[in-house]
């Protein structure tokens, strides 16, 4: 097994938890997210609020295996789970009635990962 190197000590722990949950709940979505989080920092996902607004519908549950940035505006009420959020992104999502979750909170809420869309 490949050793995961990261300057953020939270990353390898989260990747391990995602793999365990994928196996335990027969949910391949968590394994896919773990692979995306294991990428080098220069290839990590960064999604702006404007992209969420462009592609999401009202009430969607989105999973971003990276960081959510605050550029743009949001017009739909969505639940967004991500590795991290910028302060402006968090306030923009919550301003329209959406929820910001960590990936761990999403796993606790929805262990099977049903009706979750990965946005990368």
UniProtKB/Swiss-Prot annotation:
InterPro entries: Ribosomal_eL18, Ribosomal_eL18_arc, Ribosomal_uL15/eL18, Ribosomal_uL15/eL18_sf, Ribosomal_uL15_CS. GO terms for molecular function: RNA binding; structural constituent of ribosome. GO terms for cellular component: cytosolic large ribosomal subunit. SUPFAM superfamilies: Ribosomal proteins L15p and L18e (SSF52080). HAMAP family: Ribosomal_eL18. Belongs to the eukaryotic ribosomal protein eL18 family. This is Large ribosomal subunit protein eL18. The lineage of its organism: Archaea, Methanobacteriati, Methanobacteriota, Methanomada group, Methanococci.
């Amino acid at each position: 097994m490949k050793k995961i190197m990261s300057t953020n000590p939270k990353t390898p722990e989260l990747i391990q938890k995602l793999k365990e949950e994928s196996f335990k709940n027969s949910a391949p979505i968590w394994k896919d997210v773990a692979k995306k989080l294991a990428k080098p920092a220069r290839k990590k996902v960064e999604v702006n609020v404007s992209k969420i607004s462009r592609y999401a519908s009202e009430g969607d549950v989105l999973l971003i295996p990276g960081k959510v940035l605050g550029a743009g505006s949001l017009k739909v009420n969505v639940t967004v789970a991500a590795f991290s959020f910028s302060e402006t992104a968090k306030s923009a999502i919550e301003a329209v009635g959406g929820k910001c979750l960590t990936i761990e909170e999403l796993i606790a809420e929805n262990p099977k990962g049903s009706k979750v869309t990965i946005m990368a």
